[in-house]
């Protein structure tokens, strides 16, 4: 089911004194799509969301939702539901009154308000808590109520501003999955802002990676992971090894293998290849020129760190059962799987 | 029960009694004096009856109560939206507003009266020679106390997030303040209001030097001729103040309990509350 509308951010710029928080951001979101904006602190992702919500004003550029220009429309007239990073339930209202608040502002009668609020609470599984106050709920429950409250008004766009960052790891994963389930169920166009790459890759239809106010790459999670367009994306999304490589004829030679160089790589010469730990292979070899530095156990997987003959440290990710055979100091041969790699200039 | 806790309880009991006597004895003395018949001996309630039978005193009580009400209303109308606006839209102005609000504490009443004389010529020209025009100067006088009470209440809530949540749900600025902010700073508003009432009912210098007959001015005047009535009026004002504080404590008790529950719930660890958004 798709209830969503398209969203168009065009050439958005936002300047705070000497700081350029957004630098010509252009983003198109399809109806019903969930797009995650991912990036480090200060990259402009929250600024973009706040401008879309009407809580901040762009220095230049335009915001359009469903073909309607909303650039100068105030926040309370935009029909957008928002879940904030900080707990935002109104402390003086019960859960059900919180969820019904937006409907009250729209002049709905009490019966309709309560019925819709109960419907939303059922959607997020909190019907039993309808008469409690925010202070009586856990952090995860508060954010679920905030989600129900944002959806109760049947918003044209749902905005999620790092809604999970205040929660502990287990609740974060549960709520992340729940947000995706609910979003798919109601079909609302959604913009999700996060600095957690795992969160973004897990829930989004497309992920936009931002750096210094600019959109570096916007792509489906698998595409973004496999084919990063820029060194920043390669580095920010997933762990990366930087391994010396030689590029010629679209092929990169590294770790004794020749693999395709991804678009965006240097055209020829020496550079650094961005290699994912899962693409690195380690083989026990008494005559190997590399040696195991350390083994990090991470549950089902382990990371084996090796030092190459030239001193470069490379991390390989493998099943813990496979990593058991390695101990620090063991001589090994390090290789790379024949997937594409991005090769950047050695100074980059 | 060990000796330490018994000793602690004893000490607490002794302190309770000592402080109780310290505060209650003057009140008892006032009550005793105000019910004495100084001419014939024995007891009389004439001084208390004078509070409503003496026309000048009765008028002064009404004027003082009206001044208290008008001062509280005007103070809240000016201060609450201003403080909310400063916190949300102009945090750079917070220091200036705080300085201006606290300034009256540092200026003697006599200086205020002299300074306001010219201003009050205009006030009298437009509004007449009513004692109720003291409302304006009283609003200035209560600013330091009201500011502190409201500032504490506003600091206790995440004003930015709550108001942005309300606006994103369709509330305009007035609805945001009336339906979301005010209910969550209610205890601060009550504190500011009650402290302001206490200040207004206790103010003498400005009213006296400005020539207006407020309750305190009347108490001093009556005290020159009729001691018991003057003391009865003073005691009534004191008891009224105590009752106000008691009501304040009762009204905010429930909210303090809620606050205690709030404190037990883990707060966001990485909440963005201010500064340039990411």
Question: What is the predicted role of each segment?
Answer:
Chain A
Residues 61-69:
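Conserved ABC transporter NBD signature motif
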Residues 25-36:
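Pre-Walker A (P-loop) beta-loop-beta motif of ABC nucleotide-binding domains
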Residues 229-273, 277-293, 305-325:
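ATPase nucleotide-binding modules
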């Amino acid at each position: 089911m798709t209830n969503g509308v398209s969203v168009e951010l065009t050439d958005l710029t936002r300047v705070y004194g000497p700081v350029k928080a957004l630098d010509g951001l252009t983003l198109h979101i399809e109806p019903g799509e969930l797009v995650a904006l991912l990036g480090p602190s200060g990259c402009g992702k929250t600024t973009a969301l706040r401008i879309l919500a009407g809580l901040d004003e762009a220095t230049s550029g335009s915001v359009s939702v469903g073909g309607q220009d909303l650039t100068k429309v105030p926040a309370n007239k935009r029909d957008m539901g928002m879940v904030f990073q900080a707990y935002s339930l109104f402390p003086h209202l019960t859960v059900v009154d919180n969820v019904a608040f937006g409907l009250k502002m729209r002049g709905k009668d009490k019966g309709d308000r309560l019925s819709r609020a109960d419907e939303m609470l059922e959607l997020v599984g909190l019907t039993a808590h309808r008469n409690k106050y925010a202070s009586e709920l856990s952090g995860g429950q508060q954010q679920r109520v905030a989600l129900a409250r944002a959806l109760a008004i049947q918003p044209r766009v749902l905005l999620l501003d790092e809604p999970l960052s205040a929660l502990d790891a287990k609740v974060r994963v549960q709520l992340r999955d729940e947000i995706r389930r609910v979003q798919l169920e109601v079909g609302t166009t959604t913009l999700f802002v996060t600095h957690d790459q795992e969160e973004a890759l897990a829930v989004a239809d497309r992920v936009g990676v931002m750096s210094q106010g600019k959109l570096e790459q916007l792509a489906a999670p698998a595409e973004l992971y496999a084919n990063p367009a820029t060194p920043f994306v390669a580095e920010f999304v997933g762990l990366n090894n930087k391994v010396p490589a030689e590029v010629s004829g679209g092929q990169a030679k590294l770790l004794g293998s020749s693999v395709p160089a991804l678009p965006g790589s240097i055209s020829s010469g020496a550079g650094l290849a961005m290699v994912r730990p899962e693409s690195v292979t380690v083989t026990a070899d008494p005559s190997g020129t590399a040696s195991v530095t350390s083994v990090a156990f991470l549950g089902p997987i382990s990371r084996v760190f090796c030092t190459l003959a030239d001193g470069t440290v490379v991390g390989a990710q493998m099943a813990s059962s496979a990593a058991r055979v390695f101990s620090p100091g063991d001589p090994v041969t390090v290789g790379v799987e024949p997937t594409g790699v991005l090769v950047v200039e050695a100074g980059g | 029960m060990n000796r330490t806790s018994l000793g602690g309880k004893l000490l607490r009991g002794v302190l309770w009694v000592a402080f109780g006597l310290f505060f209650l004895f003057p009140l008892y003395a006032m009550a005793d004096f105000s019910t004495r018949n100084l001419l014939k001996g024995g007891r009389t309630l004439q001084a208390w009856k004078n509070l409503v039978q003496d026309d000048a005193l009765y008028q002064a009580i009404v004027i003082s109560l009206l001044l208290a009400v008008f001062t509280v209303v005007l103070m809240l109308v000016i201060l609450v939206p201003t403080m909310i606006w400063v916190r949300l839209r102009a945090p750079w102005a917070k220091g200036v507003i705080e300085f201006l609000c606290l300034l009256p504490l540092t200026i003697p009443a006599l200086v205020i009266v002299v300074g306001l004389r010219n201003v009050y010529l205009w006030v009298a020209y437009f509004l007449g020679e009513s004692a109720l025009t003291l409302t304006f100067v009283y609003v200035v006088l209560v600013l330091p106390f009201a500011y502190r009470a409201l500032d504490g209440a506003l600091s206790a809530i995440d004003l930015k997030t709550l108001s942005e949540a309300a606006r994103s749900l369709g509330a305009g600025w007035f609805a945001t303040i009336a339906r979301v902010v005010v209910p969550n700073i209610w205890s601060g508003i009550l504190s500011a209001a009650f402290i302001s009432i206490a200040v207004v009912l206790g103010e003498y210098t400005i009213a006296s030097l400005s020539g207006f007959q407020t309750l305190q001015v009347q108490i001093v005047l009556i005290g020159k001729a009729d001691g018991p009535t003057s003391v009865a009026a003073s005691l009534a004002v004191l008891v009224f103040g105590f009752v106000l504080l008691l009501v304040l404590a009762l009204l905010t008790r429930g909210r303090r309990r809620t606050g205690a529950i709030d404190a037990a719930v883990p707060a966001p660890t990485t909440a963005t509350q201010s500064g340039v958004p990411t």
